[in-house]
Each structure stands twice: as C-alpha cells, then as structure tokens.
C-alpha cells in the first residue's frame, strides 16, 4: 500500500521540474522577459552543453559491471517486438494499407512513440523518488542504450526514408541502374531541403549518383550577402545569394494583355525593363551575375515564322498565361527561357498540353525559389496555382513524374510497381545511409558524452579510480544545472508553439494511447517473457509510461515526418505524464 508520505516524496522530487518548465513558459507568454532569439540561445546551450554533461554525469557514475541484464533484455525485447510487428505490417499488400498511412512513415513514428520515453530528464528523478536509488541505476542503463543504440537506429530509419524519397524524386526510372554513390563532404543529411542528387557516368562506364548540398541550403548560408547588379543593360537582377527580403519590382505584364480580362484596380509599379532588355530566369547558377545568353535574333525570326500557337479562349481551363514577347521562348542557355518585350504575343502552355509544350514551358533549374521570381506579378495574374507549377523547379517536377507513374499504374498496384522501380541496389542504399548517419553521429555532442562516460565508468569501476576533484566538481555543477535547464528549455518550447495540440484531437488521443498504454503493455509482456517479477516489473512498466522523448521529436521535425504528432506528445504528454505515472505507481503498488 502506498503511503501519503511516499506520495509526497514523489511529488517533492517531480513538481520542482514542472516549476522550472512553467517559469520558462511564463517568461515568454505572460511576462515577455525572453525574446525568440534569446530562447534559441538557451536551447542551444541546453542541447550542446547542459544535456550532454548531464548524460555524462549519470553514465560515468553508474557501475556497468552491476548492470541488470534481465532488465536490459526486457527493454530490448520490447523494442524488437515493436519493430517486428511494424515490419510485418509494412509487408502487407498495398490494398490492405490505407493510402494516407505509408508503412515506412507510420512505422518510424509508431516506433518513436511507443518505445522511446524521456528517460534522462523525467525518468531518473521520478523513478528514484518512487523506488529508490537502485531504479536510478536502471534508468542510466536505459539512457546508455537509447543514446548509443536506439537513437542511432532511429536516425538510420529516418535517413533510409530520406534516401528513398531522394532517389525516387531524382531517379524515377534509372534508380536500379545506379552502381556507385558519392556524397560530398558538406552533406550531413539526405533530407530533401539539405541535399540534392544528380547522375554522372563514372570512368568505368557505370552510372554513379552524386549527392551534394542543396541550393536551398546554400542560399540560407549566404542569405545575408549583398545583391549584385547584372551586367545586362538597364536590368538589375539579384543573384541567388541576395537577401530574401529584397523588394520585388513591378512588371509591365498586366491582365490587360490577356483577352477577356480587365486590369486590376491597383496600378502596378513601373518596371525597369526596357523594350530591348533581355533577362534570364536562370537563378540557380552558382555565379553571382547571370551568364550572357546565346540568344540569336535570326533564329528567333525563323522560330516566329514557323511557330504555331494553339488557339483557345478558355484560359482558365487550359492554364495558359500570355506574355508580351518578341523572342523565342527557348534559349540555348541550359534550355531556360529568355523573353524580350515586343509586339508579338506568346503563350506559356503546361507540359501536358499538346503541340508546342516543349518550347513554351518555363522550366527553372533545380533549387530556384519561385516565390522570389514570381512575387512581382503573382498577384496580377491571379493564377497562383499555375505560376507555382511553372516555378516549382526540377525537383518538384521529378516528384510529380513519380506520382504520375504511380497513378497510371492503377491505384495500389501501381504504387507497388512504382516502389519497385524506384528502389536502388541494396549496397548503394546502405553505403549512402551509413555515410550520412556516421556524419550525423560524429557531430552530435550526446554521442561523445555517452561513449566517453561509458568508457570512464568501465575504467573507473574496474580499477577503482576516481575522477580528479576539480573535474568532478566542474561536471557536477554543470550537470546539476542541466536537469533544470532541460525542463526550462521544454517550457520555452511549449511557449513558442502556437498550439498545445497541433495534430488534431483524434490523432492526439490515439498517440497518447500508444504512448501511455500500448508501450507499457508491450513492456509488461516483454518483462514477463524474460522472467522479471516484483519491484523490477513495476519499474519497467512505469519507465515505459514516461512522457515522449525529445530526440525523436527533433528528428521528426528535421525530416518533416509527423512532427505535429511528436510535438503534441512532448508538450501535452509532459503535462499529463505526472498524473498518469502516479496512477501506474498506485495501481502497481496495490497488486
């Protein structure tokens, strides 16, 4: 039977953590003490210094030779059972899997939600207050396994998913022909906004995939650069490294140029483009000034004489955009469009239209931002969807091609065939994923903290040596602050989110059920399977009912996979975790 004194001791150990979290929340939401920039600095300190030192402190002070192998086996078996069940579910025929639930995506999220709790920040103080110091040593063992094994496996799964998406988008028809892979040194992740790929023929004649840093990532690194003027007369064109906040200039293009449309009430600003000015839409060049076009006037005249424009009056249905142009819509500069003002009228026709589609469609290069180039006339046209399609870039176009292939294949069966065509050889995928995972791990301070702490504990408890007092006290001071700062950082995160429940109530309820009921149930079954009974079984179940871990949410947000679900579990789960774990503690104490 749980006494009131024992319940008070549990509350006295856990409530101060919630006080730190609420102080941080109030500092942002109620009192306005901290700005978003200051919150980012605090979170950076917690992630790089406080939490790694907290992990090192707990791991280095725990005796690895007294590890409870049954408890570790139960925790491992729980995760293996969940992975096996998810793997079996992902192998079901496509007709049994809802289209809105991609097996790999849901498997990663369900594994994170059901098996990876917040053991370091919440688990150690809570379990120590409930079951004594011995449970703290057990939690340290879980922390070591999470940091070294399970978070690495989770990162591997995220990178595997990112690699599949990247290859399917860039090589929809030739993925099976890839024989080698090269990853540039500055690429640390295969996530779509950070990496892009292209194919080249190796000296031995085989197809090689080259993964490089995406143009979006390069632009973000050079966003503060000063815009340069183009060498084109009378035309100021900002390079890709220019500020994103540059004010777009007006264009001479108006709705009056489209038959049957009236110009808007608000007049557009005058454009600085002259009647003879040429300008290129090539914005992904790595040079800061646009390259000169090889536009040929005589070739343009011949093109005008032979060109045929498809007659139509239904601009809405055919998604045509008229542009005042006196030149051919095709340029010899990497196949990009070059326009010149004049008396003729050209129409831009989408790629699925017949006849002149290949010579009339604007196809920006990979990485070009459509918002920057279309901002000056996006409102005037009134067809944002059409402009978005024209400005989407090669990456989106290739992704659309993959989706079209799936659609033509006929529903679920077509999706299965498309997935089969997009798969690269296993050796190529493995090398690609291991390269990026290794680069991520060697840049993560928690990896070093866990490995160094485990190494020191193995040496210290084997040869009975102690850490120098100066070093020990320095680490102790920072690690003591790390626990409170970690909760403070959680409060800052809660305050900066627009909603506590960001994924919808039904999804949140299902996720909470998986986190607080399904996970502990699997842990209880795994513990019983390895022969755990008594207090150790109670510790295992309560440990599995802790709130959601933060690292899975960080990965989910970075890889853009169900981030709202993990965000809700971190925020709302932290609020309801204390009463839920107390209920588990009381019920298990009565059994």
Curated annotation (Swiss-Prot):
It is a multi-pass membrane protein. (indol-3-yl)acetate binds at residues 51, 118, 120, 151, 550-551. Residues 243-254, 283-292 have a biased composition (Polar residues). Keywords: Auxin signaling pathway, Membrane, Transmembrane, Transmembrane helix, Transport. Residues 395-407 have a biased composition (Low complexity). Its main location: membrane. GO terms for biological process: auxin export across the plasma membrane; auxin polar transport; auxin-activated signaling pathway. Residues 28-38, 94-107, 159-450, 496-511, 557-568 are cytoplasmic. Residues 243-269, 283-313, 344-374, 392-420 are annotated as: Disordered. Belongs to the auxin efflux carrier (TC 2.A.69.1) family. May act as a component of the auxin efflux carrier. This is Probable auxin efflux carrier component 3b.
């Amino acid at each position: 039977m749980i006494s009131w004194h024992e319940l008070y001791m549990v509350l006295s150990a856990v409530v101060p953590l919630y006080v730190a979290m609420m102080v941080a929340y109030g500092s942002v939401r109620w009192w306005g003490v901290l700005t978003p920039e200051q919150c980012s600095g605090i979170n950076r300190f917690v992630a790089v210094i406080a939490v790694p030192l907290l992990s090192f402190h707990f791991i280095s002070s725990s005796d690895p030779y007294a590890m409870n192998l049954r408890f570790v086996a139960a925790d491992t078996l729980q995760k293996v059972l969940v992975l096996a069940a998810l793997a079996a579910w992902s192998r079901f025929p496509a007709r049994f899997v809802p289209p809105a639930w991609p097996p790999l995506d849901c498997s990663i999220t369900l594994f994170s939600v059901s098996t990876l709790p917040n053991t370091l920040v919440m688990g150690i103080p809570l379990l120590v207050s409930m079951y004594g110091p011995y449970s703290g040593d057990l939690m340290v063992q879980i922390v070591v396994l999470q940091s070294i094994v399970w978070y690495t496996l989770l990162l591997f799964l995220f990178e595997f998913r990112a690699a599949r998406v990247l290859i399917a988008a860039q090589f929809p028809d030739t993925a099976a022909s890839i024989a080698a892979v090269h990853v540039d040194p500055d690429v640390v992740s295969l996530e779509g906004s950070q990496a892009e790929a292209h194919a080249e023929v190796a000296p031995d004649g085989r197809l090689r995939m080259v993964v490089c840093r995406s143009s979006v990532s390069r632009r973000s690194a050079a966003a503060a650069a000063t815009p340069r003027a183009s060498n084109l007369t009378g035309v100021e064109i900002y390079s890709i490294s220019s500020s994103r906040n540059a004010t777009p200039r007006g264009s001479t293009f108006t709705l009056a140029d489209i038959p049957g449309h009236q110009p808007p009430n608000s007049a557009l600003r005058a454009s600085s483009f002259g009647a003879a000015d040429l300008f290129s839409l090539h914005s992904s060049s790595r040079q800061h000034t646009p390259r000169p076009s090889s536009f040929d006037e005589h070739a343009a005249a011949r093109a005008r004489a032979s060109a045929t424009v498809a007659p139509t009056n239904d601009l809405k249905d055919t998604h045509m955009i008229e542009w005042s142009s006196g030149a051919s819509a095709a340029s010899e500069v990497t196949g990009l469009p070059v326009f010149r003002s004049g008396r003729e009228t050209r129409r831009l026709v989408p790629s699925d239209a017949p006849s002149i589609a290949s010579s009339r469609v604007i196809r920006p290069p990979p990485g070009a931002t459509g918002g920057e180039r279309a901002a000056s006339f996006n409102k005037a046209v009134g067809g944002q969807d059409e402009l978005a399609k024209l400005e989407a870039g090669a990456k989106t176009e290739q992704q659309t091609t993959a989706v079209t292939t799936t659609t033509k294949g006929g529903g679920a069966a077509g999706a299965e065939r498309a997935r089969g065509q997009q798969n690269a050889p296993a050796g190529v995928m493995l090398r690609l994923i291991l390269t990026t995972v290794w680069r991520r791990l060697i840049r993560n301070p928690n990896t070093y903290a866990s490995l160094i702490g485990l190494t020191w504990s193995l040496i210290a408890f084997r040869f009975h040596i102690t850490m120098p007092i100066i070093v020990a006290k320095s680490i102790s001071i920072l690690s003591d602050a790390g626990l409170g700062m970690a909760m403070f950082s959680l409060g800052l995160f809660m305050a900066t989110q627009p909603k506590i429940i960001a994924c919808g109530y039904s999804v949140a309820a299902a996720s909470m059920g998986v986190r607080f009921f399904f996970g502990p149930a699997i842990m209880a079954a795994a513990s019983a399977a390895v022969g755990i009974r008594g207090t150790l079984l109670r510790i295992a179940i309560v440990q599995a009912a802790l709130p959601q871990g933060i690292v899975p949410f960080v990965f989910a947000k970075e890889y853009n996979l169900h981030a709202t679900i993990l965000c809700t579990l971190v925020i709302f789960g932290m609020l309801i975790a204390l009463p839920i774990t107390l209920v588990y503690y009381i019920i298990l104490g009565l059994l």
